[in-house]
Amino acid sequence: MKQYLELCQRIVDDGVWIENKRTNKRCLTVVNADLTFDVANNQFPLITTRKSFWKSAIAELLGYIRGYDNAADFRALGTKTWDMNANDNLAWLNNPHRKGEDDMGRVYGVQGRSWQKPDGSTIDQLRKIVDNLSEGIDDRGEILTFYNPGEFDLGCLRPCMHTHTFSLLGDTLHLTSYQRSCDVPLGLNFNQVQVYTLLALVAQITGKKPGLAYHKIINAHIYEDQLSLLRDVQLTRTPFAAPKLIINPKIKCLEDLETWVTMDDFDVIGYEHHEAIKYPFSV
């Protein structure tokens, strides 16, 4: 929590007001933020200064792992995070590539599991990474990226947290995740849970020990309609100790994540938190 709160305070104190054309709102903004999560010692980075709905964040990550491209599939997993971007984003609603209600297009997990090649075939980036790591191989290119500028017009949203690089040192697996843009009051709560959980899951299914997860954010911002709640409410609260994430040990391989795993296979213990805060969401 300390590094999260320090980032929030840094934005409040040092941020610059930037007009965001997509949302027609101003954002208090800083550039370059680095967070580190201790997965080895199960220090789960769940926000305690407000109630956090961690299951929705992990459900979204599971949808990415499965390569889902439809908001209905995410809802079936237990998260509504894609409903607004799929169905209320005016630019996407007017996009001729949109296939209909709940369609997200070629975003996030679609790119991670089915990156289009010029010859019409596809690359399964995640499969390659898992196969290599399972064999103890780190080719210095164990990279999962969702950032495909050539297909931005085929999806409802450019990826915010866009690239994950796995590094194997001995039998310990580390992760570095890159995020171009972060809505700190709302998005970071989800994003840091996903960075942590992605390393924990990939380490588990490849038989490696989890190490550290490094979360690198380029543009960290607070929307103008979120500022008072963050500054005058959340930042006045005393944080609690970090909880622990429990993952079903029966999850052994990528196919398990693709097929039978549900939110019932995850639990959080020792989670103390303050009351929820309803921050505005900008589409």
From Swiss-Prot:
Q: Could you tell me what reaction this enzyme catalyses?
A: dUMP + (6R)-5,10-methylene-5,6,7,8-tetrahydrofolate = 7,8-dihydrofolate + dTMP
Q: Which InterPro entries match?
A: Thymidate_synth/dCMP_Mease, Thymidate_synth/dCMP_Mease_dom, Thymidate_synth/dCMP_Mease_sf, Thymidylate_synthase, Thymidylate_synthase_AS
* Annotated pathway: Pyrimidine metabolism; dTTP biosynthesis
GO molecular function per UniProt: thymidylate synthase activity
**Origin: domain of life:** Bacteria
GO terms classed as biological process: dTMP biosynthetic process; dTTP biosynthetic process; methylation
Fetch the HAMAP family from UniProt.
Thymidy_synth_bact (MF_00008)
Its protein name is Thymidylate synthase
Source organism of this protein record: Photobacterium profundum (strain SS9)
